[in-house]
Amino acid sequence: MTKISKKTVLVGLSGGIDSATAAKLLKQVGFNVVGVHLRLWHKKPSVLKEREDLVKGVAQKIQIPLIIYNAQKEFKKYVIDYFLKELKNGRTPNPCIDCNYFIKFKILSQLASKLKADYIATGHYARIKKIKKNNKVIYELLKGKDKNKDQSYFLWRLNQNILKKTIFPLGEFKKEEVKKMADFWQIKITKSIKESQNLCFTNDLEKFILKNFKTHKGAIIDLTKNKKVGEHLGIYFYTIGQRKNIRVPYKEPYYVVKKDKKTNQLFIAPASKKEFFQSNEIELERINFVSHKPKLPLKCEVKIRYRSQFIKAILFQKYKKYHLKILKPVSFVTPGQSAVFYQKEKLIGGGVIK
């Protein structure tokens, strides 16, 4: 990174190596760095205190001031309440998408405006490219250089107002390089914060569901026979593509392919009958285009889950609604999850699967 004149940047600090290294990098190139830790939610207040103590230690090591912002109210509204609402409607939400947009980036942006800071930054593995098009400055969101760690998928809701004042210091680096930098600067996290694909606000989803919903057992229907073959534990416990806890008397693997909240029925099909769980068209809602609305139809590559492979598709509009035509049928398209579309390195936008 190039040396710059003194400008202030607010850096989101989680207590992990990535955000700590991002903050140190920015300080090294001449920014006036202020750390911001967002207090979210955990059922054990002691866990929150442990994390805050960890972040304080990181800020002290890097020698930067630290702001601790209580974001519990916003987190409950935009993440937990939305998650519960989607579950209640029979969908499988990805709360990390809304957490990034409504909590991390919106709150950091609001604090930056209030404190008259020039930029905000996080430890995400993603990149931003500033271009000029038709005499207009546009900020494009790109994949991180480390393809295994790329986190652009989670950022599809970001807009130009946020991107124009955002810096991703780690976007050009691989995880191994970040670890080496942290070692060189002796940034040590005394208590490891695990990188996890699980929900940050609960480590036991079943208990969380039982606490928030009345669950009822119901029929499991085999779609190939159109008859009841078992009983499920409660429809909220299952998601499309799930194999676990399907209690049926078959040796062949069976998967959840559909849920009917009204009848409390779970529909399954065997792995050998792909016609029951494959799709070649996806309808989207809550669409966002990061830079600008592209000319449609648009050839693109799509991810329908964070760790899924890219699939070739065409984005188009039908009756004013956005659809993805999948060129090769894809399995277990899950309502509530995010479909994010790219052209090469550039993230064009995303939407929620209807």
What are the functions of these language-model segments?
Residues 3-6, 14, 121-354:
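AMP-forming adenylation/ATP pyrophosphatase catalytic core
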